[in-house]
Amino acid sequence: MQRVPAIVIPALAAILASPAAATAQHQQQIQIDEWQVPWEQSRPRDPFVGPDGKVWFVGQRSHYAAYLDPETGDFEKFDLDDGTGPHNLVVDGEGTVWYTGNRTRHIGRLDPETGKIEKFLMPDDRARDPHTMVFDQEGNIWFTVQGGNFIGKFIRGTAEVRLVEAPRVEGSRRGNGSRPYGIKMDSHDRPWIALFNTNKIATVNPETMELRSYELPEGSRPRRLVIDSHDMVWYVDYARGYLGRLDPATGDVREWANPSGEGARPYGMAIDSDDRIWFVETGVQPNRFVGFDPATERYFSNTAIASGGGAVRHMFFHEPTNTIWFGSDTNTIGRAKLPPRRRGIS
């Protein structure tokens, strides 16, 4: 373990240097604070706020898990085996950290009290790169395997791993797998998965482990997704620069063009307790943190990320503080303070 203090990058006003930025000055801007991670060029990513308020994240390039204490600004690091390539983590109610060993085909369990790590290997060698995780209502972990082309369920009580192979794709320049990517749970405890190498979103029946997919507009490439309080599936279309909404009951899809247009490259995504959608446009520099209100069907917030962002890949909404946490390719951990919650949400 290694504990070090942080350098804080203060929030800056949006940089008005592009058409998107010029439009943004007419929209609400929010406060974004960033902490410089002390381990250089480590690609800190996928933060998750634990029960004690510490913000856990992984260093994908430098093979560690770490936390930021936002009260003190201190960081503490837990080294993983060289070559692990951790991609994502989640923290359970007891404070135990679970991470994906993206380059070593395992899910890891880290005990922060002792530093002890326990590894759970994938039962199929093809499931080589566990990617993104999410808890279900029973505390089990659903996860994606991007290159290996699986969706998985890790049952914590027995350490059993169940895998469902995603559909194959013909004629793609990015290989013949669907590339399961972002994953979230709905209110019925069903996982929803963005199939990034397709124009489809999938779900898995938790009882039968059968997969069903829903088609999006031609050319769409969904990368991340969130589920609102009505079980509507919202996604960012990385290829075309759209925010989309899938109604699972009908299969209907609606789309809204991103503020920065076709080259927006929307990536990291979150939803707050008012069902407002937040995502980051990574195709523009500095990256832009964008808010969309489904009640008005309008973009209402657009803020530049002071460090530039590079790429913000994943985001976490912390309801008790009404904040969104993210990691950036500029080696920072960021916190966005959201506008006050609305009243009378239907």
Give, region by region, the residue ranges found by the protein language model.
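A short helix->beta-strand "capping" segment at the edge of beta-propeller domains
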Residues: 25-41
